[in-house]
């Protein structure tokens, strides 16, 4: 085993950086974790805690026959710190994994800071360290000086898109004589509050969104803004067509107020909602609720006026209004290998949204792999590549091999997995087959490299460097 001459440097304590720093330290390698907050705040963050969830508080579906849920299970078996803490701070969200974002981030901050091999430096790095092993996890809001230095290093302009966050309201301000608790098709707990709209209410709400005054974008004109399709502002959906929202975040199917009786009763057919606004619990106490799918760039006064048009929210008290910010990412297919190393400098690794993976879970997965490989490099070992039959492995294969000219951020999904040899015709069976293949291949890979948990969902494991 090689002698460790200097600590690994991790830049950025978001989801990816927090996971990376932990994996490095757990492998017995000292690490210095740089975080510029609170010395310098980003446009989207509200605290100085590590792994702050700046958009939703949900990591997506938990079921392992869904891409998001399968990625969760992969990360649990790999010994992810972030997913261990997500389970500890889970709040009701039907079939989704949602967390109390404040408790989750504060716990992660304490846990990482208390590790004897982790040194925290609350300062901004304005340029890439030129020596040693470095893991870059600065996210889509990388500070201007560091972004300029990275641009100089890669010789490339950044790609970019606009991202947005949803408003949060207090639970006591929601009229629960109108809003009702339910999960779609009664799956899981009745964890969502649902605000029903009839046709007239929906059309008036859509008209208000289409004609509302938007906040001015700082980076360039609104007309040239590109949005990530998985996180479109609600007003953008409204502009795309009369029914677009009803087939998206305001989809009413599978939801009915049980106080009115059975939705299947003939007399209740006319009482089915034309559209539904869902609110998801933000904290364990149920004091805060997030408007699901209501990312927005409306001015704050307009948000209050228009969102209070929603039945049940006429007296809503907003603790956070929706915000929009520009996300930048590098053209990963031209720069990175599937090990998340830069080809022109293998001791520089990167993870998170900066490399074009989309979503919280993907950032954690990238942090896990980049951190694991940084530790292996420090110990004189060869870096690893995850099997591409895994959701995580397929994602990193995609971002390292896609067509650079058309590269856009990619979320976890089954569409980028290798084809099954004998795919079932039924979609549910096909997704289950993807899951079974992935978990078997992960188990084989773990046994080969002596890494992580070999049994499902057993919490933390010590990273092994074999």
From Swiss-Prot:
NCBIfam families: gid_trmFO, PRK05335.1. It comes from Synechococcus elongatus (strain ATCC 33912 / PCC 7942 / FACHB-805). It is found in: Cytoplasm. Its cofactor is FAD. It comes from the Bacteria. GO terms for biological process: tRNA methylation; tRNA wobble uridine modification. Disulfide bonds: none annotated. The lineage of its organism: Bacteria, Bacillati, Cyanobacteriota, Cyanophyceae, Synechococcales. Catalyzes the folate-dependent formation of 5-methyl-uridine at position 54 (M-5-U54) in all tRNAs. It is an enzyme of class 2 (transferase). Its EC number is 2.1.1.74. Belongs to the MnmG family. TrmFO subfamily. One of its GO terms (cellular component) is cytosol. InterPro entries: FAD/NAD-bd_sf, MnmG-rel, MnmG_N, TrmFO. Its main location: cytoplasm. FAD binds at residues 12-17. This is Methylenetetrahydrofolate--tRNA-(uracil-5-)-methyltransferase TrmFO. Keywords: Cytoplasm, FAD, Flavoprotein, Methyltransferase, NAD, NADP, Transferase, tRNA processing. The gene is trmFO.
């Amino acid at each position: 085993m090689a002698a460790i001459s200097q600590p690994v440097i991790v830049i950025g304590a978001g989801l990816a950086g927090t996971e990376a720093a932990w994996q490095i330290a757990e492998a017995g390698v000292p690490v210095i974790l740089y975080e510029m907050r609170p010395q310098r705040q980003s446009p989207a963050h509200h605290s100085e805690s590590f792994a702050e969830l700046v958009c939703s508080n949900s990591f997506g579906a938990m079921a392992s026959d869904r891409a998001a849920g399968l990625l969760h299970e992969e990360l649990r078996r790999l010994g992810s710190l972030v997913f261990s803490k997500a389970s500890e701070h889970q709040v009701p969200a039907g079939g989704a994994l949602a967390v109390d974002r404040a408790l989750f981030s504060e716990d992660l901050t304490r846990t990482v800071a208390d590790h004897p091999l982790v040194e925290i430096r609350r300062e901004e790095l304005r340029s890439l360290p030129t020596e040693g092993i470095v893991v870059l996890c600065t996210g889509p809001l990388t500070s201007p000086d560091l972004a300029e230095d990275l641009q100089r290093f890669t010789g490339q302009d950044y790609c970019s898109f606009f991202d947005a966050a949803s408003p949060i309201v207090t639970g006591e301000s929601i009229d629960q004589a109108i809003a009702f608790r339910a999960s779609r098709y009664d799956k899981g707990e009745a964890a969502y509050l649902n605000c029903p709209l009839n046709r007239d209410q929906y059309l008036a709400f859509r008209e208000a969104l289409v004609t509302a005054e938007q906040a001015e974008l700082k980076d360039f004109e609104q007309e040239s803004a590109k949005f990530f399709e998985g996180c479109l502002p609600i007003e953008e959906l409204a502009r795309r067509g009369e029914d677009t929202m009803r087939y998206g975040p305001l989809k009413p199917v599978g939801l009915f107020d049980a106080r009115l009786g059975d939705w299947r009763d003939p007399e209740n057919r006319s009482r089915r909602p034309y559209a539904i606004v869902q609110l998801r619990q933000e904290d364990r106490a149920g004091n805060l609720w997030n408007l699901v799918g209501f990312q927005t760039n409306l001015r704050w006064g307009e948000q209050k006026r228009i969102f209070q048009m929603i039945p049940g929210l006429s007296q809503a008290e907003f603790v956070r209004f929706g915000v929009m910010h520009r996300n930048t990412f590098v053209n990963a297919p031209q720069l990175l290998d599937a090990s998340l190393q830069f080809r022109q400098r293998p001791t520089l690794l990167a993870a998170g949204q900066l490399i074009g993976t989309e979503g919280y879970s993907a950032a954690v997965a990238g942090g896990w792999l980049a951190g694991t490989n940084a530790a292996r490099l420090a110990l004189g070992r060869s870096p690893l590549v995850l099997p591409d039959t895994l959701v995580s492995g397929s994602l990193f294969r995609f971002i390292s091999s896609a067509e650079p000219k058309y590269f856009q951020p990619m979320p976890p999904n089954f569409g980028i997995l290798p084809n099954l040899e004998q795919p079932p015709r039924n979609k549910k069976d096909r997704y289950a087959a993807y899951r079974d293949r992935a978990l078997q291949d992960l188990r084989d890979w773990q046994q080969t490299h002596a890494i992580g948990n070999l049994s499902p969902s057993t919490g933390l494991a010590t990273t092994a460097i074999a």
